[in-house]
C-alpha cells in the first residue's frame, strides 16, 4: 500500500495554502482528510478525473482518520472502473488503484474550489457557495440512492 494520498504541487501551493491561511471552514492542517474528501466530492460531481502532475503527499495512509474512508475509495473505484468489467472484481482489493482514482477526482475538485475562490473573492460569498455545493451534493446523493441524509428535506 502506498504511504500517502497525493495532491498536485499546484494545489498545495495554491488553493490549499489559501484555505490554510484563512482557516476556511476549519479545514486546517489537522483535518486534511476532510478537505481531501470535500474536493473528492466536488470532483465526482464534476464527473471528470484529472491526472496529477508533479504531486506531493497530502495524507499519510497510516493516519487513523483516513482509514474509515478506504471502503468509500474502493466503492468509487468499483463504480467508476470495475463495474464496467466485473470479471476484474478481484481488483477491488487493489487499494493503490483506488487511491490513484480518488486522487484524480480530488484533483478536479481542487480545480473547482480554485475557480470558486477566484470568482467569489468575498469570504462570506465563498462560504455560502461552498455550503450550497455541500447541500446540493447531499441532495443529489439522497435522490440517486433513495436514502435520507442529514440535509434531506
Where are these predicted regions, by residue range?
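Charged, low-complexity intrinsically disordered terminal regions and linker tails
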Residues: 1-14, 18-22, 49-153
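Short pre-active-site segment immediately N-terminal to the catalytic Zn-binding motif
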Residues: 23-27
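Short, basic amphipathic alpha-helical segments that act as recognition/interaction helices
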Residues: 28-55
Amino acid at each position: 500500500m502506498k504511504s500517502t494520498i497525493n495532491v498536485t504541487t499546484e494545489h498545495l501551493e495554491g488553493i490549499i495554502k489559501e484555505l490554510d491561511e484563512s482557516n476556511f471552514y476549519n479545514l486546517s492542517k489537522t483535518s486534511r482528510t476532510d478537505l481531501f474528501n470535500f474536493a473528492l466530492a466536488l470532483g465526482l460531481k464534476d464527473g471528470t478525473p484529472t491526472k496529477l502532475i508533479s504531486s506531493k503527499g497530502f495524507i499519510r495512509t497510516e493516519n487513523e482518520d483516513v482509514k474509515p474512508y478506504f471502503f468509500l475509495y474502493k466503492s468509487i473505484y468499483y463504480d467508476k472502473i470495475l463495474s464496467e468489467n466485473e470479471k476484474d472484481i478481484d481488483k477491488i482489493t487493489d487499494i493503490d488503484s483506488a487511491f490513484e482514482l480518488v486522487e484524480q477526482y480530488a484533483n478536479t475538485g481542487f480545480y473547482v474550489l480554485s475557480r470558486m475562490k477566484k470568482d467569489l473573492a468575498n469570504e462570506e460569498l465563498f462560504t455560502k457557495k461552498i455550503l450550497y455545493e455541500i447541500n446540493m451534493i447531499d441532495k443529489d446523493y439522497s435522490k440517486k440512492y433513495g436514502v435520507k441524509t442529514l440535509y434531506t428535506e
